[in-house]
């Protein structure tokens, strides 16, 4: 994933930057295509930026989406400390992966399949770690392991994005810069470091402006 670094010095610029980033995120979410929104789990609003980025990936493979959403939707049980329910969800997620693994792998381009297999091994370990955290009723540990496991699932999902995928842009915007894909921006300010992801899959012109 390409990276760029920019520098701003004053607190006023830092405040304006935060406003720009908020607009970017809002614009990116508004411009997500209907199929991406359809993949979002129903019920509670999705607020985790990492989950939103996973859901916005343009690919068509329902099994790994279900795997992702099952883990993401453990938040309510975790807040209520319903450890028995959490244990059942993790076990069912593990069973789902075992039965759908080959189907998911077959959807990954052959050249990337070895990478996907290695990532699934990490997901396997992550699910084992989650079961241990459930047994220990370790809430902070469960959150950390879930975040890491979902990150590996997201990496597999990124491999499912069609090669050369580009969002169609009207011809009148041909002169504008655009980003097809995603980029991570590391931004240094007097208030500290900021890291943000700009999503060219769904808002290529907004992302290209950075």
Indicate residue ranges for each PLM-predicted region:
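N-terminal secretory signal peptides that target proteins for export/translocation
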Residues: 1-14
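Sec-dependent N-terminal signal peptides
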Residues: 14-27
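Start-of-domain signal
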Residues: 18, 43-67, 73, 80-89, ...
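N-terminal signal peptide c-region/cleavage motif recognized by signal peptidases
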Residues: 33-34
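Boundary of Sec targeting at the N-terminus
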Residues: 39-40
């Amino acid at each position: 994933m390409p990276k760029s670094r920019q520098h701003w010095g004053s607190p006023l610029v830092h405040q304006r930057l935060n406003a720009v980033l908020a607009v970017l995120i809002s614009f990116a979410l508004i411009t997500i295509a209907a199929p991406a929104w359809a993949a979002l789990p129903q019920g509670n609003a999705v607020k985790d930026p990492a989950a939103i980025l996973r859901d916005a990936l343009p690919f068509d493979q329902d099994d790994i989406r279900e795997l992702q959403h099952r883990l993401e939707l453990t938040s309510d049980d975790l807040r209520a400390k319903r450890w028995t329910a959490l244990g059942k969800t993790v076990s069912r997620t593990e069973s789902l992966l075992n039965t759908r693994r080959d189907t998911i792998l077959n959807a990954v381009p052959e050249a990337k399949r070895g990478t996907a297999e290695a990532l699934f091994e990490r997901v396997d370990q992550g699910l084992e770690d989650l079961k241990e955290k459930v047994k220990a009723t370790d809430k902070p540990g469960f959150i950390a392991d879930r975040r890491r496991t979902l990150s590996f699932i997201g990496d597999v999902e990124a491999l499912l994005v069609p090669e050369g995928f580009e969002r169609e842009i009207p011809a009148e915007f041909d002169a504008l810069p655009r980003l097809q894909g995603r980029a991570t921006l590391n931004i240094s300010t007097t208030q500290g470091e900021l890291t943000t992801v700009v999503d060219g899959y769904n808002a290529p012109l907004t992302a290209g402006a950075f």
